[in-house]
Amino acid sequence: MIVQAAGGIRVVVTLKDHRLDLEAMARAITPMTKLVFIANPNNPTATIVTAKEVEEFMARVPDRVIVVFDEAYIEFAQGPDFPDSLAYMKQGRKAVVLRTFSKAASLAGLRVGYAVADADCVALLNRIRQPFNVNSLAQVAALAALEDDSHILECLRMIEAGRHFLSDEFTSLGL
């Protein structure tokens, strides 16, 4: 939707073994490319691209191209191999990091998330966003979630228990 709204042409790069193919994504970048999206962890495959893979990819991305890291599921993928996407912003790269309160904080119905970006990008986003895109209740809930680590940990524990339950039930059905 973002690409179409901006009058751009979307280029889809096929997954390789259920993972983002950063090599193919780098090859797909042309002089017309303005934006690249990396969903990490990927949805729906839950696979990640590692810090090393992202570093190699970023070395091939021209400085003029904005790299958007969609990290909606970041709380489910912490570990030593997971890239620090915020570091690219600190290095002065054109990067945007998107995160949400929908998943780990269980606030999906409130439709609240955030972007971390440089001032120029934020100014651009403010020009195209809806004027009242996050209601007051969602803002209060998001702020409360930021201050309540135990809530996030409990939500993650419950989600993990649900995953194990589903896996066990599918196994018992022979699926």
Where are these regions (language model features)?
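Structural motif
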Residues: L35-A39, V68, Y114-V116
